[in-house]
């Protein structure tokens, strides 16, 4: 899962699918979704799948490539866009020769960015090209600062993963799941919240960081209100 951490250089909030990856030399192009690199975009309820279509020479109708196409309309070069601050899946076919170095470029705003989160799963990312600590805390000799004030932004805190906001980060083979833990007053051991904790080690405030360039799932429990997460810019004046 990768992130759209830059704005287009013209200052707009959306980037064309065709322009998302500037260096296309490492992309795998094919004539089906299964043989091509894919970009998968979540809209809150379903994925839209795009694949990098090669030029098909046996039918003039399909002399459109290589370019990105919607898997449901593969004869037409897509004009769809993705919003800055989103996360997307980038999927490679199993036959791909090697890892690709994906480069996304643009401008960095000095203004804060607002992430809208709804009940259910939201695919988002840091809106800026920097690491994003989940908690502000001291780690050894380093003070790491989270760019989001979770309390003022209304993050949903609970004492189980199912009753709390979650952040789920994919490492290439599995998800690391974190949830926003509330203060638990019945046991002094757990007077740690509200803060983000690893679901596998929920008694300890996590030093976890979402790496620059990586998207993630932000899951809000059903029945809770939608909200806005305000992320500070690293170059704010």
List the predicted regions and their residue ranges:
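A short, polar beta-strand/turn micro-motif
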Residues: 1-35, 43, 79-158, 208-237
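Fold-core signature of tandem repeat domains
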Residues: 39-41, 50, 90, 167-170, ...
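A cross-kingdom feature marking solvent-exposed beta-strand/loop segments within repeated
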Residues: 46-84, 174-212
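Intrinsically disordered, low-complexity segments enriched in Gly and acidic/Ser/Thr residues
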Residues: 127, 131-201
């Amino acid at each position: 899962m990768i992130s759209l951490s830059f704005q287009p250089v013209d200052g707009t909030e959306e980037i064309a699918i065709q322009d998302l990856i500037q260096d296309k030399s490492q992309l795998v192009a094919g004539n089906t979704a299964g043989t091509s690199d894919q970009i998968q975009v979540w809209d809150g309820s379903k994925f839209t799948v795009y694949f990098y279509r090669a030029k098909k020479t046996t039918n003039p109708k399909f002399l459109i490539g290589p370019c990105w196409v919607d898997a449901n309309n593969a004869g037409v070069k897509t004009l769809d866009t993705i919003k800055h601050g989103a996360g997307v899946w980038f999927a490679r076919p199993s036959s791909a020769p090697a890892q690709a170095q994906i480069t996304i470029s643009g401008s960095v705003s000095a203004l804060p960015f607002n992430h809208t989160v709804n009940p259910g799963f939201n695919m988002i990312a840091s809106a800026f090209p920097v690491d994003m600590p989940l908690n502000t805390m001291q780690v050894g000799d380093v003070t790491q600062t989270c760019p989001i004030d979770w309390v003022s932004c209304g993050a949903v805190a609970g004492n189980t993963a199912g009753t709390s906001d979650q952040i789920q980060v994919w490492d290439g083979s599995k998800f690391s799941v974190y949830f926003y833990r509330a203060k638990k007053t019945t046991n002094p051991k757990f007077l740690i919240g509200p803060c983000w904790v690893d679901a596998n080690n929920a008694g300890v405030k996590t030093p976890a960081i979402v790496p620059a360039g990586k998207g993630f799932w932000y899951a809000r429990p059903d029945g809770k209100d939608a909200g806005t997460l305000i992320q500070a810019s690293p170059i704010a004046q």
